Amino acid sequence: MGILESISNQKAATRRVLRARRDNLDAVLCASHSAAVLTHLFQLPELNAAEVIFCFISTGTEVSTHGVIDRLRALGRIVLVPKILPGEPMRAVPFTGWDNLTQGVLGIPAPLESVAYPSYVDLVITPGLGFSPTGTRIGFGRGYYDRWFATLEHGLRVGIAYECQLEKYLPTETSDVPMHIVITEQR
């Protein structure tokens, strides 16, 4: 077995463990932990100074970002969300409201609009199955975020997750882009 195949197998096994941990949290705990993450997130000076913020739209047992998106919009910020089209890189598309979403690729809610935002992003709120305290991220295995990060000239990358999704070590490849900051309900 080659090194890359070994890393790929390690990542697949790690994803299974981390997904199971997250999915074993009950709805009440997910809601309270998500509220705590939101509180920590809005204590970031970089978020409060940001004008253009990219934020994933949470699904299932992920840390809920619905309150984050609503609060940012209420503050007058430009909120961008992911849009994935078959065979194309992920795009950052303006969020125009919960009523303007459709079921996108991979079952993830996405804007009806497909035109990418033409400018910079100040801060990126990033999903993941797991993170290390130093910012290493393991996503869902399709590479959309890592490839998109490679196109960004700047922008603070902030990973959000539950504390149970943190691991001291995560298997990585050279294409994996780390976070600048990782926020959980405890930190």
Predicted regions and their residues:
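Conserved phosphate- and dinucleotide-binding cores of soluble alpha/beta proteins
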Residues: 88-187
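N-terminal active-site beta-alpha-beta segment that forms phosphate/nucleotide-binding
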Residues: 2-119
